[in-house]
Amino acid sequence: MESRENQYCWPKAEAVYPDRPGRSYVLKRLRYRLRAFLHRGLIAQFEQFINQHPFLVKLLNEHADYSYPLVYRFLDKRFNSKKRFQAICENLLFLPEKLTALSAPIYKTPLSFGEVIPDFEMTLSMTTHQPMEGYWVLELWHKPRNELVYLLTFAKLDEALLISVVQGPNFEGSKEMVKQLTKTGHGLRPAYLMVETMKALTKALGFKTLLGIPQKYQNKSRFIQSSHYVVDYDAIFAESGGQLKDYWALPLELSLIHISEPT
């Protein structure tokens, strides 16, 4: 019989929502159990799929929250359970399979693209944020303070890549940092820097189509803990040259239209 370490089983509610000092997650665990019960057939298929890939067994056993999107939401609020299953399975595999030449697997070690502008480093890695928004993320770090400034989460959707999240900071002094970043980037605002970087990555990975999630179908992010900070995805994608159909279709040519004088 295989040991539990070498086998994946759907995680228990306590693994996804453990109680913390001063906080109880009883209701969240109840919702989790109900959703799991309603999707028990899908969960059985998912367990079978994961157990065919040893590295995914270890990965999902270490990250209990990576499984939850299967029975809740993943990428697009319109996805039904079948589409979530297909998209999750595909996205867990596609980037590790694309980047087999790396010395360390992308799901273990972030890939650094170096300083895209002085003091700011861009990395590609597996998410440590909300997996329902996608498993893969570009992150912009302020190196002197080792502080995450911006992120862009993306996923494979059929034969395209899909931007599902573009988020900025909400820590003390973040507004000044964004101004500094815009000034250092010769007027290129950080949100658009992330989109332009994603365009380049799309081509580097061999894809010909880059899409953006329409605002009303985007899963709510938790990176910014503020009800007063609203990211206008439709405006970002429109100003990046996107055309709205089912998704925003973005051109892969790099653009300079986002250059502006920081105020």
Question: What do the PLM-derived regions correspond to, one by one?
Answer:
Residues M1-Q180:
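Non-catalytic substrate-recognition and accessory regions of acyl/acetyltransferase enzymes
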Residues E2, N80, S226-V230, S260:
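Short, structured coil/loop segments at alpha-helix boundaries
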Residues L59-L60, R73, Y192-L193, T202-K208, ...:
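Noncatalytic linker/hinge segments flanking ATPase motor cores
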Residues L148-L151, A155-G242:
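Acyl-donor binding region in acyl/amide transferases
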Residues I213-K216, Q243-S255:
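Acidic carboxylate-rich catalytic motifs and surrounding loops in phosphoryl-/glycosyl-chemistry enzymes
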Residues S255-T263:
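Residue-level detector of conserved catalytic or cofactor/ligand-binding positions
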